[in-house]
Amino acid sequence: MEVQIGIDLMGGDHSPLVVWQVLVDVLKSQSSTIPFAFTLFASEEIRKQIQEEFISDLPQEKFPKIISAENFVAMEDSPLAAIRKKSSSMALGLDYLQEDKLDAFISTGNTGALVTLARAKIPLFPAVSRPALLVCVPTMRGHAVILDVGANISVKPEEMVGFARMGLAYRQCLGDSKIPTIGLLNIGSEERKGTEAHRQTFRMLRETFGEAFLGNIESGAVFDGAADIVVTDGFTGNIFLKTAEGVFEFLQRILGDKLEADIQRRLDYTFYPGSVVCGLSKLVIKCHGKACGSSLFHGILGSINLAQARLCKRILSNLI
């Protein structure tokens, strides 16, 4: 049975035609062993342009269905403005997902708008009060799962415990056989470090996960592979993620070709799928607004794998 993937062509930092070309590359690459099909959401102008000028890019049987939208959510739109655009490409894609016409929905658009619209249209799991954005980052021991990286500015300690459970389910989808370890991102490793909310979260994580909870970890220890799952609030997590991306881009510019290909691959966040909006009953994935080329290519392939692995059902079973 084909995995149905919906993709919002609009609203990212690049032209919709750049996203289209990546989709063509995915369809031609045969990189996935999982049968899949795309449904695209775009303005009428872009739909016509693709069907008139790029019809020869793919065989007719592989050509994706394109759904016309009246408008799209821009990067500068507030979440409230996004909600008012009821027929935007993002809103239509989430409607299709909610109606079970899709197994996953991907957007490179406005993060705040995507999370807000997804919460409005897609039910949360009963045990979840807030969703979290989850990403994988490379480490010396493989990779770590980090959440939240931007969905919530501040969270309650009990919500952080829920984030850890969702991270465990995600690692299981990646085929981890061992029991993953959990760390709390903080300004120091000692138990007393951080705010009162951090200290309360520390105690709750220790009570819930026992020896699997390693305690507080600092930002640098994340890349050492100190923990398999790193829990944080969205404000701190977003700063951490964007700093990591900036450091890698800095190294690329400074070292250029001196970085060997295998090292570049290990460091490059573009080889990891986009952020998963965890806690929703259906799979929503946010790829970076600047994503193009290998970044979006691997984000889409990763999304296909997560949809096939029934990530949302696994998360639910981990929460109840």
From Swiss-Prot:
Entry's localization field:
Cytoplasm
EC main group: transferase
Q: Which InterPro entries match?
A: FA_synthesis (IPR003664), Phospholipid_synth_PlsX-like (IPR012281)
Per its UniProt record, what Gene3D superfamilies does this chain match? Isopropylmalate Dehydrogenase
Q: What is its EC number?
A: 2.3.1.274
- Molecular function terms from GO: phosphate:acyl-[acyl carrier protein] acyltransferase activity
Q: Which Pfam families match?
A: FA_synthesis
**GO CC terms, sorted:** cytoplasm
The reactions it catalyses are: a fatty acyl-[ACP] + phosphate = an acyl phosphate + holo-[ACP]
Q: Which domain of life is it from?
A: Bacteria
Q: Which GO terms describe its biological process?
A: fatty acid biosynthetic process; phospholipid biosynthetic process
- Pathway linked to the protein: Lipid metabolism; phospholipid metabolism
Q: Its principal location?
A: cytoplasm
What the protein does?
Catalyzes the reversible formation of acyl-phosphate (acyl-PO(4)) from acyl-[acyl-carrier-protein] (acyl-ACP). This enzyme utilizes acyl-ACP as fatty acyl donor, but not acyl-CoA.
Q: Which PANTHER family match?
A: FATTY ACID/PHOSPHOLIPID SYNTHESIS PROTEIN PLSX, PHOSPHATE ACYLTRANSFERASE
Assembly state and interactors? Homodimer. Probably interacts with PlsY.
**Similarity annotation:** Belongs to the PlsX family.
What is this protein identified as?
Answer: Phosphate acyltransferase
Q: Which species is this record about?
A: Chlamydia pneumoniae (Chlamydophila pneumoniae)
